[in-house]
Design a protein with these regions (language model features):
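Non-catalytic accessory regions of SAM-dependent methyltransferases
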Residues: 1-122
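Short coil/turn connectors at secondary-structure junctions
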Residues: 40-43, 65, 151-152, 222-223, ...
Length: 252
């Protein structure tokens, strides 16, 4: 099924980065005519060169510096719940090959075809940070797709990232699902931690530090460890589990 979207055009020469794989077009690269300026933030658009060559489908925000974010290089792409589910399924399959337990960064924004969206999975809970107007309009479909593809019971849509303000979004958060209270377990490198997905920093846990925690743990056997600005205690507890003689964690 073909989908018709409003059209925006790039200024002459502005197509080079997009044609070489960059996923964004900045506001000063787009011919901001009256029709483009009138589009609602987050609208799906067909993006073209100045001479009408099709470059794909993007989400568009005329009020943002990053005005267009490419969703697909196919001009015929349909962006709906089915498309979102396919992208999340692909992301899940990739992560399940890397990790033996379902505790990981499920979606890495543009890298997984979800511009401005980060999703962390804590077994049957997922935390989703939606930082673009286009993805905000699809937030319920994203949550549904995550639940359908992973089987999680709750999806927390966190809206407290300051990046959202650049897109004209508010800071409200909500839970899709039966709800939850308090902390959740995080299993990483054989150690069970606790994280607060509702009000902890960002999604409640820094999965990008997994390898660094594992590296520090290798050095910890018999050592005295000081973990300053410990937050959830990820580094200190990893060292303790690896045989550190003494661990001091400091935060405020």
């Amino acid at each position: 099924m073909n989908q018709t979207y409003p059209t925006i055009r790039l200024k002459p020469g502005a197509q080079k980065r997009l044609m070489h794989g960059h996923p964004w077009a900045f506001s000063n690269e787009i011919a901001m005519d009256a029709a483009a300026k009138a589009l609602e933030p987050g609208a799906l658009v067909s993006i073209q060169t100045d001479n009408g060559e099709q470059l794909g489908v993007a989400i568009f925000n005329p009020h943002s510096l990053i005005a267009a974010r490419l969703m697909s290089a196919s001009p015929q792409a349909v962006i709906d719940r089915t498309a979102l589910r396919e992208r999340i399924a692909h992301a899940r399959n990739m992560r399940d090959r890397l990790y033996d337990v379902p505790h990981y960064r499920l979606a890495h924004a543009e890298a997984d075809g979800l511009p401005g969206v980060a999703i962390d999975r804590f077994d049957d809970v997922a935390v989703c940070q939606v930082n673009t107007a286009g993805m905000e309009r699809l937030a319920d479909d994203i949550a549904a797709a995550v639940m359908e593809e992973t089987g999680v019971k709750n999806v927390i849509l966190r809206g407290d990232s300051p990046i959202r303000r650049l897109e004209g979004l508010d800071d409200s958060s909500r839970v899709v699902g039966p709800g939850l209270t308090g902390a959740v377990d995080v299993i990483e490198n054989g150690v069970v931690f606790r994280a607060d997905p509702m009000s902890g920093q960002k999604t409640g846990w820094f999965f990008d530090q997994r390898d660094n925690r594992a590296f520090m743990a290798k050095l910890a056997d018999g050592a005295t460890v000081l973990d300053v600005y410990s937050h959830t205690g990820g580094f200190g507890l990893a060292c303790a589990a690896a045989g550190a003689q003494h661990v001091t964690m400091v935060d405020r």
